[in-house]
Amino acid sequence: MERVNVVGAGLAGSEAAWTLLRLGVPVRLFEMRPKRMTPAHGTDRFAEIVCSNSLGGEGETNAKGLLQAEMRRAGSLVMEAADLARVPAGGALAVDREEFSGYITERLRGHPLLEVVREEVREIPPGITVLATGPLTSEALAEALKRRFGDHFLAYYDAASPIVLYESIDLTKCFRAGRYGQSADYLNCPMTEEEYRRFHQALLEAQRHTPHDWEKLEFFEACVPVEELARRGYQTLLFGPMKPVGLVDPRTGKEPFAVVQLRQEDKAGRMWSLVGFQTGLKWPEQKRLIQMIPGLENAEIVRYGVMHRNTYLNAPRLLGETLEFREAEGLYAAGVLAGVEGYLESAATGFLAGLNAARRALGLPPVAPPEESMLGGLVRYLATANPEGFQPMYANWGLVPPVEGRMGKKEKRQAMYRRGLEAFSAWLSGLNPPLPRPEAALV
């Protein structure tokens, strides 16, 4: 059987390759790192996490929780790795990034049907191919896509939060708590009104890195840099990453005027990231601003925030709900390139693209999950959204049909969760050939 090409070994590409391998389809996995690195990556590992280490909230009231459950049912390698590399994060699924990517890399590299090619792909390969090149798609491949399909690209700039060393945090000025008395997995640095005023002003005056091109900045709303939020108004941060609602300072018995939250990044608890503080500021400015935060005056920064370009397709113009290009049989897109936002969403689209690439290789028709499932709702959005001003999408309850009947918000979401997982499970059970259990892919 001819090998299927998977271009890019991020979360989407890794999941696509794994799905193909589980169905007995040989895979040629292209990854340009380490021969050519990106501005955001630091290793040559597959599924390297370069932004937050959280795969989203868990539970039956959370849309990402439903997508997580669907992926577990599907035998996802990414979910298998996430469950093994989990670190405490309250109601969210967060991972130790080194353990996570290391596990996925070893699982894939050990499979006898996988060929790994460490080189940049500059043209669309012939044959059945999954493109999962991520937000930092190389210029050469982007140009090849434009020549093939027209100028249907959009671009915005993602930003990642700084990480500080736990032992350098002054814990006498912070308190552990989750909002509304939930699990105390977060460190909270409270600010008075005067401290916030000075911090906000410093953000407005801070120098940013100059982008590599002069295109208009189009930020995805879930990943707006903190300095951009500050520019939107004095109170914007107070209703965003610095909101104090539901956090009571035990020293005062009151909610602070503002708060900066830190979340554990690794299993050992040595590294903590500033939640919602994605930034593209120059590094000396980041250090100055972080040290204005109570408790972080002497913080040791182990990773500065970075800003990098994100390239993605105008999915409604180019892709169907099976993630196959409408004008190119046997060519699929997955992950951020396909127009989704988030680690889990990238992996989920990688699963579906890999599944349909395998079915084409086996001479079978393509499939798409039911609309009640979160993955089904997500890919239908990609295929049917308004192409004018198209923006990346992440898992949310607006992607699936509402349930009927009078019930509270919590009960309604729980009902949507149960309905979606049941529909997805039934869809999986009806696949022919069936997806082997994850253990069947072990070697």
Swiss-Prot record:
Pfam families tied to this protein: GIDA
Catalysed reactions listed for this entry: uridine(54) in tRNA + (6R)-5,10-methylene-5,6,7,8-tetrahydrofolate + NADH + H(+) = 5-methyluridine(54) in tRNA + (6S)-5,6,7,8-tetrahydrofolate + NAD(+); uridine(54) in tRNA + (6R)-5,10-methylene-5,6,7,8-tetrahydrofolate + NADPH + H(+) = 5-methyluridine(54) in tRNA + (6S)-5,6,7,8-tetrahydrofolate + NADP(+)
EC number annotated for this UniProt entry: 2.1.1.74
Superkingdom of the organism of origin: Bacteria
Keywords: Cytoplasm, FAD, Flavoprotein, Methyltransferase, NAD, NADP, Transferase, tRNA processing
Spans through the membrane: none
InterPro entries the UniProt entry points to: FAD/NAD-bd_sf (IPR036188), MnmG-rel (IPR002218), MnmG-rel_CS (IPR020595), MnmG_N (IPR040131), TrmFO (IPR004417)
Coiled-coil ranges (or none): none
Gene Ontology terms for molecular function: flavin adenine dinucleotide binding; tRNA (uracil(54)-C5)-methyltransferase activity, 5,10-methylenetetrahydrofolate-dependent
GO cellular component: cytosol
Cofactor(s) recorded in Swiss-Prot or TrEMBL: FAD
HAMAP family: TrmFO
General function of this protein: Catalyzes the folate-dependent formation of 5-methyl-uridine at position 54 (M-5-U54) in all tRNAs.
PANTHER family: GLUCOSE INHIBITED DIVISION PROTEIN A, METHYLENETETRAHYDROFOLATE--TRNA-(URACIL-5-)-METHYLTRANSFERASE TRMFO
Protein name, UniProt field: Methylenetetrahydrofolate--tRNA-(uracil-5-)-methyltransferase TrmFO
Gene that produces this protein: trmFO
